[in-house]
Amino acid sequence: MAKLNIVLFEPEIPANTGNIGRTCVAAGTRLHLIEPLGFRLNEKEIKRAGMDYWEHLDVTRYIDFADFLDKNPGAKIYMATTKAKQVYTDVEYEDDCFIMFGKESAGIPEDILVQHPDTAIRIPMLEEIRSLNLGNSVAIVLYEALRQREFEGMKNEGQLTKYEWGSRQPGQERNLTEQRLAAEQGSSHGDAQG
């Protein structure tokens, strides 16, 4: 399975980072955290959002952006920002590339963005909306990168626990619901008359 890397630049909200950690585990993706963080990694909000997946997360911390660059020389870094000119679906995400997202309150600083004009990407949204939730943004871009790899190594098919797909006739559930509603209406009319 090809490895991708999600980078959070100075994340501030523990629940967002916990959710992103869970997404990274589900996608077989590494998480990189650039300090300062707006929380401690042992906070209960992270663990609650990440559930029991956090212990399986491949996570690396860096003291600042310079430390990140020093420890990942030559890294191809895509910068997810509302300020970018190209859409996230217009690029091809290489193996071992890094997709960086900025802090919730301010995004990625412009002095970093201007160093990466060809790899700055954005998620389209209505003009009057400032930004999407950080966890949602990570999931959107990450799953586009995984889609480009045809979800290699991932489970692409689920299964029901009580039934098998195709074992019930189409529309049968609707008929049962209609019968239940009719029975409830009949009993409520009886109560009103009695």
Where are these regions (language model features)?
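Post-transcriptional modification and biogenesis factors for structured RNAs
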Residues: M1-G194
